[in-house]
C-alpha cells in the first residue's frame, strides 16, 4: 500500500559514490519524524516495493518519492531519498526536474574524493558495498591510474558545482563525511535545524560499519606515485587528508 496523505517536507541527499550516504540515512531514520527511503534511482534498492518504477517519467518518480512514498510506522513530517552522481547519467533530465521540485531541501555530502574513489574501486572488486558487523578482514589494497583519478576528481568538482549552482543557498546544506564520523551529534543537529525537524537525541544504533580503516598510504598501493604526480596542483589536498583517523562506525 502506498502513502497518499498530504506530503511532508521533501529533502534529498546528493553525493558522489562511497561518501557515507547510507550511514547518514541510517542515522536520520532514527528520528521519529524523518523518513529517508534509500536510492530512488537504484532499481535494486529494497526500500521501494515498485521494482518497475524507473519506467515512470522523471516527474512521476519524484511524486512517488515525495507524495506516494512507502508507508512507515511513525508520523513522517520530512521525507527524502538519496541519489548518487552517476545515477543522473542514465536520466539526463532528472536533475533539472529535481531542482524544480517545490520546497526541496538538499543535503550535499562530500568526502575526500580520493578516499571516495579508492573505496569505490575496492567495493567493485569485492562486491561488498555495505558492512553490518565488525570483522578482521581488510579490503584489498588497490592501485589507481592517473587518468582515472583525474577523471573522477573532475566529475566530483563538476557535480558539486552543478548542485551549488542549481539550488538557493538557503535550501542547500553541505556536510563533510569526516565531520559526520568525528562529530556526528553536531552534524545531525545541523541537519535537523536545516530541515526544520524537532531536536532529537540519536541512539547511535546505526549498524553500518566502516569497511576500510587504513590510511590512504596503506590502502592505495601507488599512493606515493600519485601524490608526486598531483603535487602542487588543485588535487594535492586529497593526498594530505584522509579519514583513517576517524573512529569506526
UniProtKB/Swiss-Prot annotation:
InterPro entries associated with the record: Nod_factor_sulfotransferase, P-loop_NTPase, Sulfotransferase_dom
One GO molecular-function entry: sulfotransferase activity
Signal peptide feature range: none
SUPFAM superfamilies assigned: P-loop containing nucleoside triphosphate hydrolases (SSF52540)
Coiled-coil residue spans: none
EC number: 2.8.2.-
The UniProt record lists the keyword Transferase: yes
UniProt-listed Pfam families: Sulfotransfer_1
Annotated keywords: Nodulation, Transferase
Functional note: Required for the formation of sulfated nod factor. Proposed to transfer activated sulfate (PAPS) to a N-acetylglucosamine of the nod factor.
Name assigned to this protein: Nodulation protein H
Gene: nodH
Amino acid at each position: 500500500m502506498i502513502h497518499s496523505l498530504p506530503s511532508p517536507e521533501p529533502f534529498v541527499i546528493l553525493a558522489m559514490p562511497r561518501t557515507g550516504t547510507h550511514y547518514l540515512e541510517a542515522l536520520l531514520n532514527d528520528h521519529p519524524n524523518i523518513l529517508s527511503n534509500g536510492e530512488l534511482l537504484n532499481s535494486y534498492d529494497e526500500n521501494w516495493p515498485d521494482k518497475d518504477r524507473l519506467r515512470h517519467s522523471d516527474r512521476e518518480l519524484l511524486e512517488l518519492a515525495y507524495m506516494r512514498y512507502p508507508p512507515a510506522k511513525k508520523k513522517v513530517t520530512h521525507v527524502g531519498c538519496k541519489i548518487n552522481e552517476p545515477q543522473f547519467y542514465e536520466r539526463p533530465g532528472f536533475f533539472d526536474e529535481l531542482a524544480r521540485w517545490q520546497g526541496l531541501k538538499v543535503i550535499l555530502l562530500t568526502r575526500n574524493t580520493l578516499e571516495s574513489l579508492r573505496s569505490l574501486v575496492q567495493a567493485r572488486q569485492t562486491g561488498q558495498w555495505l558492512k553490518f558487523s565488525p570483522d578482521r578482514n581488510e579490503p584489498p589494497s588497490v592501485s589507481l591510474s592517473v587518468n582515472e583519478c583525474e577523471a573522477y576528481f573532475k566529475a566530483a568538482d563538476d557535480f558539486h558545482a552543478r548542485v551549488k549552482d542549481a539550488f538557493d543557498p538557503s535550501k542547500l546544506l553541505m556536510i563533510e563525511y569526516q565531520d559526520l564520523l568525528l562529530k556526528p551529534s553536531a552534524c545531525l543537529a545541523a541537519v535537523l535545524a536545516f530541515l526544520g525537524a524537532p531536536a532529537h537525541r540519536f541512539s547511535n544504533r546505526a549498524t553500518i560499519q566502516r569497511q576500510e580503516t587504513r590510511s590512504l598510504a596503506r590502502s592505495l598501493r601507488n599512493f606515493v606515485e600519485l601524490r608526486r604526480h598531483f603535487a602542487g596542483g588543485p588535487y594535492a589536498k586529497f593526498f594530505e587528508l584522509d579519514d583513517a583517523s576517524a573512529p569506526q562506525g
